[in-house]
Every structure is written in structure tokens, then in C-alpha cells.
Design a protein with these regions (language model features):
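Class I S-adenosyl-L-methionine-dependent methyltransferase catalytic core
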Residues: 1-222
Length: 222
């Protein structure tokens, strides 16, 4: 699908390395009407929802108090008439369920302690200082909760990557996919590469022609 591929290219370095067109491409490809996002970040996937062909309802949360009001301003600016149901609390603590069964849950959580956007005690890197606690008490709890809200035939998709921390690689992708594999009715559909530009923190050999990409893992609930 050439249109979908074009939406997965990130032509310049952006904060968070996420592109609203990627979200729009995912929503349109799966013809999703009801969408959830448990780490809203800078509102990129909210923008993709408002631009999508099929999106009608967006259920999301992010604990960052500095961005919450801006989500509403952003949505009002688009003036699409679509419904949003957003919250300002940690995803693992969110107890209010969505109003509708979810077609796709698509998110890009912070990569353990690599992304630190605000110094608030509700941030996952502040709450969970080891990778084991971050996975078990934050990621797995959030994934399980969202999985329960996804309708049969719906999709869970996550943009996540392993990270280099103090000179050692931290394995994030494998534990998350292994956990998803244990959930009732889970079926691995595959992964897509979201092309990213060179980060200021990445050094590449000048004689090597290569592209950088981050994976989006896609699972279906049967």
C-alpha cells in the first residue's frame, strides 16, 4: 500500500519522533472508528485521528499536566465534530472505561527512562525506576487494561524500541511482545517500520547508506 508507506516516512527529526500521518495511516488502513491512545504525548495521534477518514471517537490519557488543556485546544482548532474522551492521569491508574468498544488501540509510550518530558511524580520514569517494575507495573498493566476494551477483530499496535542506557542495551520489545502473546485471543499480525531521520544523538558512518526505523508491532484480538 503505497499511501500507507508514504505516511510512515519521517522526513525530518521531530520531538518524540512521531508523525501524525503515521497515525492517520494506521487508522485508515484498519478503518477504525473507535480509537484509544494511552500515552498521548504531544497530541500527534490526536491529530491523526482528526484527519482520519473513519475515526469517530478517541479515548486517551496522559499524565502530563502541561499538555492536557492543549489537547482540548488542539481538538477545538480542528473543528471536525468528532468525539474525544481524554484524561490527565497515568494509564495504569485509569479506571474509567471508554464509551465504545475499541477498534484500534495505538500508542507510543515513553521508552523507559529515555524520554523525560516533565518532572512530575505521575511520570512512568519517576514511578518505576527499574526496567522490571516499568514493564510489569506500567506497560503490562496498561496493555491488559486496553486489551479488554478492544472488540473482537480489533487491533493493538504499539510503537516502541529498545534503548541504549548507560552503555548497555535495554530489551523492551521482546518482553512486551511476549506478554501480548499470553493474552486471550491474541494473534501477531507483524510489524511495520516507521522511518525516522537521524537523531542528534546517533552517529552513523558517512560511507554507509542506511535508513533508521522504529518498529510498530501489530496484534489482533480474535
Amino acid at each position: 500500500n503505497s499511501e500507507l508507506k508514504s505516511m510512515f516516512r519521517l522526513g525530518m527529526y521531530q520531538a518524540g519522533q512521531f508523525k501524525a500521518l503515521t497515525a492517520k495511516g494506521m487508522y485508515d488502513y484498519f478503518q477504525a472508528e473507535n480509537i484509544s491512545d494511552m500515552s498521548m504525548g504531544w497530541g500527534d495521534r490526536l491529530a491523526g485521528f482528526n484527519a482520519s477518514k473513519h475515526g469517530k471517537y478517541y479515548y486517551g490519557t496522559d499524565p502530563n499536566t502541561l499538555t492536557y488543556n492543549n489537547y482540548h485546544r488542539q481538538h477545538d482548532f480542528y473543528d471536525t465534530g468528532k468525539e474525544i474522551d481524554i484524561h490527565c492521569e497515568p494509564s495504569e491508574d485509569l479506571t474509567k472505561p471508554p464509551k465504545h468498544s475499541i477498534d484500534i488501540s495505538f500508542t507510543s509510550p515513553p521508552y523507559f527512562n529515555r524520554e523525560q518530558y516533565v518532572d512530575e511524580d505521575t511520570q512512568s520514569f519517576m514511578r518505576y525506576v527499574t526496567i522490571d517494575s516499568w514493564l510489569n507495573d506500567y506497560m503490562f498493566k496498561t496493555i491488559k487494561q486496553q486489551w479488554n476494551y478492544i472488540k473482537s477483530g480489533g487491533v493493538y499496535a504499539i510503537n516502541i524500541s529498545n534503548i541504549l542506557n548507560k552503555g548497555e542495551w535495554v530489551n523492551i520489545c521482546d518482553p512486551i511482545n511476549e506478554y501480548l502473546n499470553t493474552l486471550d485471543g491474541s494473534k501477531y499480525l507483524g510489524h511495520m517500520g516507521m522511518k525516522i531521520a537521524k537523531s542528534p544523538s546517533i552517529q552513523l558512518r558517512k560511507d554507509v547508506d542506511c535508513s533508521l526505523a522504529e518498529p510498530i508491532f501489530v496484534w489482533q484480538k480474535e
